[in-house]
């Protein structure tokens, strides 16, 4: 074997894109920024940083782990607190992701859609299954959904969208065990159906589109966009979304 790329942390979902003939992956970002450097990282920053990463991986690239993490707000790599005084002058030399995704959501599978059953906008786009966070306290856990990223010639052509929701079956996830199901894997059937698997009970869902594809457009996506207000999907408010202390929960 040969070294293809380096500086990659905890990749679970990896996929070859036949349209671009390139390798792509979704990366789990690091944890515990507040625990390692409480003077410079608040508990809120610990919950929303760093990004999970959607990557196009080319031969010879270095993505900076463990020396850096990706800050989705600054849209740049940042030197990790453990290495601030280790002689690393800049994080600019490291490769960037195609997109930064919400922190700690645990992207566990990646699939590029090749079928024709869904409306045309989904062709060659990326589906990502988020297993869900375990350590965003004192804020609600996040993820537990499947998202879609529209793609054009191997690059994102829009923001990520909620594609499949309802796996957790609760509105506020205090801890991982509260979620009934956790999306884990993705597969495309011969007819273009999308299959989503769960890691807790081994359940599998089949997703099909049975309406008129030619009439599908932005209006059909509005209701899905509203889902981003749910506590396990939206960015937590620093004050309003603080969870009660364990000893006050009855």
Task: Indicate where each model-derived feature is located.
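Beta-propeller domain segments
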Residues: 9-10, 15-177, 181, 207-243
């Amino acid at each position: 074997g040969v070294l293809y790329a380096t500086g990659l942390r905890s990749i679970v979902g990896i996929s070859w894109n036949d349209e671009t003939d390139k390798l792509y992956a979704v990366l789990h970002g690091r944890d515990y920024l507040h625990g390692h450097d409480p003077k410079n990282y608040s508990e809120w920053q610990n919950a929303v940083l760093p990004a999970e990463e959607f990557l196009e991986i080319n031969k010879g690239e270095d993505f900076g782990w463990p020396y850096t993490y990706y800050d989705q707000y600054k849209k740049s790599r940042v030197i990790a607190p453990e290495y601030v005084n280790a002689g690393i002058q800049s994080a600019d030399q490291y490769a960037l992701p195609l997109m930064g995704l919400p922190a700690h959501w645990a992207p566990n599978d990646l699939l590029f859609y090749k079928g024709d059953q869904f409306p045309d906008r989904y062709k060659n786009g990326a589906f990502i299954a988020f297993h869900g966070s375990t350590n965003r306290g004192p804020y609600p856990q996040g993820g537990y959904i499947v998202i879609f990223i529209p793609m054009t010639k191997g690059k994102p052509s829009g923001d990520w969208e909620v594609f499949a929701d309802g796996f957790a079956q609760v509105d506020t996830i205090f801890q991982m065990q509260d979620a009934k199901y956790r999306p884990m894997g993705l597969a495309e059937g011969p007819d273009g159906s999308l299959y989503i698997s769960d890691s807790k009970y081994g359940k599998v869902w089949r997703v099909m589109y049975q309406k008129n594809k030619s009439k599908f457009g932005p209006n059909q996506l509005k209701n899905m966009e509203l889902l981003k207000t749910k506590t396990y999907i939206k960015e937590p408010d620093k004050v309003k979304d603080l969870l009660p202390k364990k000893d006050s929960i009855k």
